[in-house]
């Protein structure tokens, strides 16, 4: 009788535990796919969304000059980190202006909230954040100092994945949060710079071609261990497939490099600054900005 009682307890404990796990996973995936299919996203006009975002812009320009090549920068899933400020200084020192876009702050997301919801894929997926990209690009005429022939996009991790999603957008596949998307209003993008993106199942580039074959440079990390989200092999397979007919994506697999290898400032365990890889990326980026040209955007 005693053993029977113990087995009954074990059986029902297992059923309850399994049910809880099922409910938790069901809740998670329902939120992920609700975002994917635009079921839980507030939709706005691009000009209103630009005004919503711009109060959190970090703009850095060179001291001398009137018009500058400009890099529009999109941070990783946890929000802006100081290493992006270092990149802005680097750009400025090389005669390049930059706008660092904060996608978390205007939405009221703290660092902890962003890590919990955005990094997990529950909130602000790439096709929604692509609306941030569109809203900014279509309102750059407010800045007279931008050289409109030399606009570049740059993204880190979630920001890189966002830019890849944005490149798939057209009048039939629009950002999930924009009411008035029109691809003819997207200005010429001279090039795209991305670091350690998510190239897996939620990345729209897995299913849809890019709107234009905009020249792109990508830096991957061979020791990237940010879960399954940023496996470099996913990106290598995807980029090789995209480059089959015409090569327009150059990627580099950085040796002895972790996720966010370009941050001198400590972020978390498992992320290590690699100066050699960062310097390599800097040299490639400057060369890319000076020589790149979009073929059909």
Language-model region placement:
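N-terminal cap/lid segment of alpha/beta-hydrolase-fold proteins
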Residues: 24-66
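Primarily recognizes the serine-hydrolase "nucleophile elbow" in alpha/beta-hydrolase
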Residues: 128-211
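Solvent-exposed loop/turn segments at secondary-structure junctions
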Residues: 76-80, 104-108, 157-160, 197-202, ...
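Hydrophobic residues in well-ordered beta-strands that form the structural core
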Residues: 100, 155, 218-220
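N-terminal Sec-pathway targeting helices
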Residues: 2-21
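Serine-hydrolase catalytic machinery in alpha/beta-hydrolase-like enzymes
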Residues: 48-58, 66-146, 263-267
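C-terminal catalytic histidine-bearing segment of alpha/beta-hydrolase fold enzymes
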Residues: 246-297
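The feature captures the conserved acid-bearing segment of alpha/beta-hydrolase catalytic domains
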Residues: 178-245, 250
């Amino acid at each position: 009788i005693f053993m029977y009682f113990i087995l009954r307890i074990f059986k029902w404990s297992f059923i309850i535990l399994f049910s809880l796990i099922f409910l938790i996973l069901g809740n998670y995936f329902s939120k992920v796919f609700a975002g994917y299919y635009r079921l839980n996203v507030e939709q706005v006009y691009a000009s209103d969304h630009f005004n919503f975002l711009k109060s959190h812009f970090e703009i850095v320009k060179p001291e001398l000059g009137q018009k500058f090549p400009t890099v529009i920068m999109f941070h990783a899933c946890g929000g802006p980190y100081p290493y992006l400020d270092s990149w802005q200084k680097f750009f400025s020192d090389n005669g390049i202006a930059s706008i660092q876009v904060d996608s978390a702050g205007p939405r009221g997301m703290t660092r902890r909230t962003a890590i919990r919801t955005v990094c997990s894929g529950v909130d602000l997926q790439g096709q929604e954040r692509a609306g941030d990209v569109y809203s900014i690009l279509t309102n750059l005429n407010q800045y007279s100092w931008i050289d409109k022939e030399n606009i570049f996009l740059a993204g880190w991790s979630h920001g890189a994945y966002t830019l890849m999603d944005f490149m798939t957008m057209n009048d039939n596949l629009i950002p999930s949060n924009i009411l008035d998307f029109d691809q003819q209003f997207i200005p010429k993008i001279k090039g795209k710079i991305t670091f350690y993106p998510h190239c897996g199942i939620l990345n729209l580039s897995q299913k849809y071609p890019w709107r234009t074959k905009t020249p792109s440079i990508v830096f991957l990390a061979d020791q990237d261990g940010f879960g399954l989200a940023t496996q470099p092999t996913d990106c290598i397979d995807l980029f090789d497939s995209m480059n089959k007919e015409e090569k327009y994506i150059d990627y580099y697999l950085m040796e002895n490099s972790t996720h966010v290898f370009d941050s001198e400032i400590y972020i978390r365990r498992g992320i290590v600054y690699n100066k050699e890889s960062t310097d390599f990326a800097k040299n490639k980026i400057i060369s890319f900005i000076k020589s790149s040209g979009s073929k059909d955007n």
